[in-house]
């Protein structure tokens, strides 16, 4: 059973501007250390910005799917987006309900990054 669907689109230059303005403070407030380390595989700044923009969109899409938004119960850094060995993005959330399964798709084109999330009950076959 589908419990929630969320989508978000991010203007990539916005993420670039935030990073340039606030530096590491921006990154550590929004991203988990593993996500930051994962960006090191990209040697140029633009590729790193795209990496972070897609993950930013995924985090926003996740809380939209939950219907809660960000607040005291969940922070952006509680949501971790990493790729599996095959390149598929996967989401891990601190203190999430273990019976929830989360499917994530992220993409970028020109100045925009987009994410789409479906949360469903893992005990019920789709």
UniProtKB/Swiss-Prot annotation:
Pfam families: ACPS. This is Holo-[acyl-carrier-protein] synthase. Its cofactor is Mg(2+). GO terms for cellular component: cytosol. Mg(2+) binds at residues 8, 60. NCBIfam families: acpS, pantethn_trn, PRK14659.1. SUPFAM superfamilies: 4'-phosphopantetheinyl transferase. It comes from Ehrlichia canis (strain Jake). It is found in: Cytoplasm. Belongs to the P-Pant transferase superfamily. AcpS family.
